[in-house]
Amino acid sequence: MPDESQDTPVLDTIAAMTAVSVAECDLAPDALLLVRLAALAAVDARPVSYLLHIGPAAEAGLTIEDAQNVLVAVAPIIGTARVMSAALNIAEALELAIAVIEEDSE
């Protein structure tokens, strides 16, 4: 039987990098997630990248208003197109998260 980690080498690498980053960072969880949200917006991340942060953000007590404030703060730096793309991608990630929760509750 093949090793499961060999089935998802890209995801495994991303998970390992994220774990090291979180372990080595001295920011509070809410601040860390806000910084990561800003970085995702800056690189025009896809919805799945935001989706991976929804659970931890909720656990840290962050709100959609916090996400909006981050986008307002970075807008002059990353530009309107990236901010609008981030807003759409966050909305798509939230829709997917809600769909998964609804499916799991049935």
Name every feature range the model reports, one short phrase each:
Residues 56-60, 73-76:
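Short basic/hydrophobic patches in alpha-helices and adjacent helix-turn junctions
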Residues 1-34, 42-44, 50-59, 82-106:
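Acidic, glycine/proline-rich low-complexity segments that act as flexible tails and inter-domain linkers
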Residues 34, 68-72:
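Beta-strand segments within the central parallel beta-sheet cores of soluble alpha/beta enzyme folds
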